[in-house]
Amino acid sequence: ELPPLFRDIEKRTFQFFWDTTNEQNGLTPDRYPSRPFASIASIGYALTAYPIGIENGWVSRTQAVDRTLLTLRFLRDIPQGPQRTGKGGYKGFYYHFLDMQQGHRYDSWVELSSVDTALLMMGVLFAQAYYDGDDAREKEIRRLADQLYRKVEWTWLQQREPLISMGWFPESGFIVHDWMGYNEAMLLYILALGSPTHPVSPDAWTVWTRTYDHDWGVYYGQEYLSFGPLFGHQYSHVWIDYRDIQDQYMRERGIDYFLNSRRAVLAHREYAIANPMKWKDYGENVWGLTAGDGAQNTRQLYRGEEREFRHYSSRGAGLRENFDDGTIAPTAAIASIVFAPEVVIPATEEMHRRYGDYLYSSYGFLDSFNPSFDYDIPLKTGRLVPGKGWVASDYIGIDQGPILAMIANYRNEFVWTVMKKNPYVRKGLEQAGFRGGWLTPEDEAVESPQSNQEAAAARALGMAESRAAAAEAQAKQEQPASNRAQPPP
């Protein structure tokens, strides 16, 4: 049973989506209270949040159905086309950021985004799977969800087949970077593979995983497929239960993506305990690097040496892409609760206890904080708390969404269970070569003791790791901090 604090976090985080979304059209802001524009990824998380609200009795099913229908109808009606202005999408994709009122592309720097469209579609397909009633309104939700997903022309963004481009600009055309593993775009490929109308071919997954070996290795005592910021180890797992299912790459490595994310979380925590950059407050219960707000793009002296600080940026600890300027985002730890509850629960409680007075408010945890940043200079965002450092002033939708959904998954596997009913997601996983676990067809489940044994072994390994980690954490209480973590060679 989770400590009572988590119920409070869930309720406040749910209210972020319920209260800040535009009641006229269902568009959810990228951030609040600054609320400059809507984010299509935020909308995907909002569509996922509403059923969590129903299940907890925070809104009625009727209210959530109304809000969901409003959103899906508006998404259907947003004008699409290649023009630079006055459109909200093209080829079934949507622009990353939309104007909160009209739903048009917010500005000329905003791209038509493949991965953000995928995050939106995960929410759309979640709604399709959840609202299974026989009445006309729930039927309309299912029909609209189908329509929106079928419209996305995934293959159009395959300019360098079989990989999918990060997006497109009406001014300059296709973005020259493609999504290659390993990162959050795992969910993009699964949705593109599962499409009934514009599917990419299975070799897309093969090529996406081809770069994995570059990111596989040992970091802070964990051997895993690395990506610096924790969001890359979380986003795909919000909707898909990767326990006991494996693609070819993970079969060869003998683990699954769930266990991989667990190792990433434990490595992040060990990095914070070792604290090679000597940032303030880092330790066993204050950790978690991901993308989020920061104070300012600036260089300042810290402990006698010049350090780079950033405003909104990806931050991470891993084998390759690392950036750490002392900024911690609570979502990094809290949304990892399914992977490593034995370290996430105490971290959440400690961050609430130590920083809650200024970090925890109406909608839960503000985006981020940096105890090491106390420079009296103009800030991009946030504020300085005397003696405590910098704290963000906004909540961010793509950081709030995983907090809410992952606590729900931890409690009763809610989001995962609903999503398992969605045939498109299942097809996408199968096309990517995933087998075992919940993907095993029922008639085959009896016939293949081999894969059952493998799955049971993987499950046992995961459980054993959890128990060992809990025991290890207990043992560490008696150790001085200095010998807790060995940084990588």
Specify the residue positions occupied by each region the protein language model found.
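Ser/Thr/Asn(+Pro)-rich, low-complexity disordered segments
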Residues: 1-489
